[in-house]
Amino acid sequence: MGELLVAPSALLVAVTVLREGLSVRDPQTVATRVPATRPSRFVTVSRAGGQLINPFTESVLLIVQVWDDDKVMGESRAEATANLCVGILRATSGTWVGDARVRRWEQNALPSYLPDPDTGIPRFQFTGELRLAVK
C-alpha cells in the first residue's frame, strides 16, 4: 500500500480563519449554516466541490455569504464585511491553520449583492478556491 495522503477539512480551516480574523476587526458569528436563531449579523461558509490539482494540493471551492438585517445600514455593512472576509482569506496564503497548511486563496467572484429571497435580508456572496496542502 502506498503512502496515505489526507486533505484537511477546508470548511474547518475557512471558518477558523474568518472567526479569528473577524473577532478582532468586526466580531460576528461564522458558521457552516444559517443559525437556527439568527443573529442580526453573521457569515456562512459552504463547500461547493473542488478538485485534487496534484497529489499534494487540494483546491476547494467555497461559497461565503455575509448577512446583515439592519434596515438602514445592512446592505453597506454586509458589503464591507464581505470585502473584509476576502482580505482575511487572501492573507492566509502560505500560513498554517492548526495543522493545515494553506497554500493560497484564489478569488473566483467578487462579493455580489444577493438578498435572501425569503426574508429580504441584505446578503453579499462571493466564491473562491482555498488551496490546501495534502499530507
PLM regions with names:
Residues 72-94:
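Mid-chain, well-packed structural core segment of small domains
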Residues 66-72:
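Structural beta->alpha junctions
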Residues 1-13, 48-57, 100-135:
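Short, charged interaction patches at domain edges and termini
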Residues 39-41, 58-62, 122-124:
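A generic structural signal for short beta-strands and their flanking turns/coil linkers
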Residues 69, 90, 133:
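Residue-level marker of positions within ordered structural domains that often coincide
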Residues 1-54, 92-98:
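Small/polar-rich, solvent-exposed N-terminal microdomains that initiate assembly or binding
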